[in-house]
Amino acid sequence: MPDAVVFSPGGYRYIPAVFQYSAGIAAEPGFEIERVRFHRPVPLAEAFVAVESHLRAIGRPTTSFAQCELRSPDPFNDQGFIDFNTEYVKTLERWGIYKDRVNPVARTNVCPMYDKPTTPSMFAFSYTVPTTSAAKRPSFQLAGGGDARGGSAPYKDRIVAFGDTSPEGLREKVVFVIEEMESRLKTLGLGWADAVSTQLYTVQNIGHLVGPELARRGCGAGGLVWNYTRPPVIGLEYEMDVRGAVRETVL
């Protein structure tokens, strides 16, 4: 995994990943991360306007935008995901964040099985704010990570235990993803003790794995939240992210 890179205009560091998102972010000294959740997911174009308005109201630049959580109607095919992401990053480019296919903003994008939005929408977002006192604890947000290895091959060629939702197939997927989360935490100089909450995103029955493969590692100290959703690309079955904001509010 690459080393974290400082995004000075935003007051945070990030783990480089792909053009559509980074693998995670953490506040730099002198800053901390706040998370804002919409009461219900807001269509993406409207949400970006709301984010700009919120940041302006608290005196923060758009470059302080560090992470977001999206909800989409259904999983994309490979090309559909590329097309969506190409459109998504245009706003980040306008905000002075995204440039030359480098994107410091972390992101989770999942698809609810029920109560799904009619269009890709934003559920929550995070940003940095300056602090004048020493941080009581580090603040960070990890991007959603699914059961696919990195690379440029089609997803079906990279998905761990592709098409296998047997108990052992799911175990292989869950272990792969949680080890990825642990690697990201380590890269940011963090551990499970720093997490506020850990989120699971799947419609598969992973109850037999929560104890031995998840809670046993320490990721449940702040609570494990199981979202009955699917990852954003057809064929993926399991995703996780980890939150560590210092404050969370609901608009």
UniProtKB/Swiss-Prot annotation:
Pathway given in the UniProt record: Xenobiotic degradation; 4-chloronitrobenzene degradation; Xenobiotic degradation; nitrobenzene degradation
GO biological process: catabolic process
Gene name of this polypeptide: cnbZ
Protein name as it appears in the record: 2-amino-5-chloromuconate deaminase
Organism: Comamonas testosteroni
Activity regulation: Cysteine residue modifying agents such as p-chloromercuribenzoate and the SH-binding metals Zn(2+), Ni(2+) and Cu(2+) completely inhibit deaminase activity, whereas Ca(2+), Mg(2+) and the histidine residue-modifying agent diethyl pyrocarbonate inhibit the activity by 23 to 50%.
Nucleotide-binding is among the record's keywords: no
Enzyme class: hydrolase
Induction notes from the record: By 4-chloronitrobenzene.
